[in-house]
Amino acid sequence: MRLTQGCFSFLPDLTDQQIEKQIAYCIDKGWAMNVEWTDDPHPRNSYWELWGLPLFDIKDIASVMFELSEARKSCANGYIRMNAFDASYGTESCVMSFIVSRPSNEPGFYLERTEGAGRFITYTIKRYSVQANAEGSRY
């Protein structure tokens, strides 16, 4: 199962050249970049681990790509995404986010159904890799 989160999620994986073009676009807009990673990309897990420091005043594509390559070396078996943050007044939010690296095997999710009193049913989305492995050893 291929995880689909963020921009470009239904397209094939971006090449480094395509990632550089997206970084250039973000820098031209004046947005700050950062790199995040996780080994639990559950749809409701919006708090991924920040890689290094946010790249606030970086205007060089090569510097951002260096941080990405270092994250890929260290977190090769997890998901890595890039975020762009617009600090302008009135926005002050993440305006672009896309996955740049993923594990070779993505086990997917399953739906767990729990029946309660009076035909009350709750559903929970759970990840196969989390069910079988502890944090840090999921891929």
From Swiss-Prot:
BP term (GO), one: reductive pentose-phosphate cycle
Record note on quaternary structure: Heterohexadecamer of 8 large and 8 small subunits.
Q: Which Pfam families match?
A: RuBisCO_small
Please state the protein's primary subcellular location.
plastid
Protein name, UniProt field: Ribulose bisphosphate carboxylase small subunit
Cellular compartments per GO CC? chloroplast
Q: What does this protein do?
A: RuBisCO catalyzes two reactions: the carboxylation of D-ribulose 1,5-bisphosphate, the primary event in carbon dioxide fixation, as well as the oxidative fragmentation of the pentose substrate in the photorespiration process. Both reactions occur simultaneously and in competition at the same active site. Although the small subunit is not catalytic it is essential for maximal activity.
Q: Which organism is it from?
A: Trieres chinensis
